[in-house]
Amino acid sequence: MMSTELMEGLTEALNPAAVEKLAISEPQWLRERRSHAWDVYERTPMPTTKLEEWRYTDLKKTLDLDALKLSTAESMTDQATWPARLRAAMDEDRDASGHMVIIDGHVVHTDIDEGLAAKGVILESLHDAVAKHPELIQEHLATEAVPAEEGKFAALNAALWNDGIFLYVPRGVALELPIRVTRWFSESATAYFSRVLIVAEHSSQVSYVDEMLSDDFESQTMTSTAVEVIAKQNAQVQYVAVQRLGKGAFYQSVQRTLAHRDSTLDTLNVALGASVTRVDLNARLLGPGANSDMLGLYFGDGDQHFDFNTSQDHTVPNTSSDLLYKGALDGASHSVFRGIIRVYPGAQGTDAYQTNRNLLLSPNARADSLPNLEIEADDVKCSHGATIGELDAEAKFYLMSRGLPLVQAERLVVLGFLGEVLSKLPLGGVVEKVSRVIEHKLAHQG
């Protein structure tokens, strides 16, 4: 059982002294922001299963904050010492406008196309950006998108983030190739806190791919990420997160996207690893003509647990969103999808859809799907749907009649089922990489 002290979030490693240590050399405004976040964290109760948004994820059973320490790893700038899996992932991501590599919370490599840098594109560690671009960071970091008040974990992250990523695209600048970030985690019994801040100015265009990797952990490790993506008027932004963490990882991510007038802001969350995954994704449509496509793909085996909590907030007239989350579950894995479309008063002309589909590959696998609508306008087109089913017998029979063995036929059906998500955001390299990981998991099913 958790102690009362732990339920309020105070542990041997997570405490005001840790916040002060991180803030000691930071500007006053950031010190105050961290301190405020810790105050919010302390007074915000730890989520329990009594809350609808946490009903299927019991933190008493899935997260032991008291056993976690903050990272003590040294910065690894020598590429020869980097893990082989990390280097392999980077080798697959050569086609890019820029790269960043983060190992155990330290940014150890950054490069950006010289022509884009000359146009004002910024790709930097968040610590460097605080020093070099204080006005931009102060305006956007933990303010409108993911403030500390967003929740218990958002407050903890805002107080204890160690480093992160800042990507800025000036007005009218288009990046033809994606920005690729590769993160590696190695320490067991550790809590990692990082942030992603992306600002795309008027009529800019950018794609961002964030891949998280680790081997299996000997004891539980938590990776906490707060993601803030801001698309100004007429900007086009794609945000992709590929989570491939090892067993023993508790992956927690709070993501908020802000889409202004006539902008397009699409997201893709791929969850293949970690023992426990919790993603809170909120898309806010803030200007007429704004659009957001929200895609998700997950594949579970063993006793993996996935919990996706999504919301589509249509705050003004004539905005659109379309969510599609699909997952395949084997072994005793469990997925939870909870989604809501909110149409605010006066937001006429809203066009919003939400679909969650699950494929159960084992009698012990489980999926819970809870789509919902909250509509306060009358001239709207909104729908939601959810399905939970088994492998299509007719599809398997057809493939077997063409000479394929049963196991191979089942793999093709699963790949086809999940492939619909990837086909909607065919970003170079991502589709192939994710497909390979899914094939590997399918090939190793018991």
What are these regions (language model features)?
Residues 2-155, 324, 329-330:
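N-terminal amphipathic, basic helical "cap/leader" segment at the start of enzyme domains
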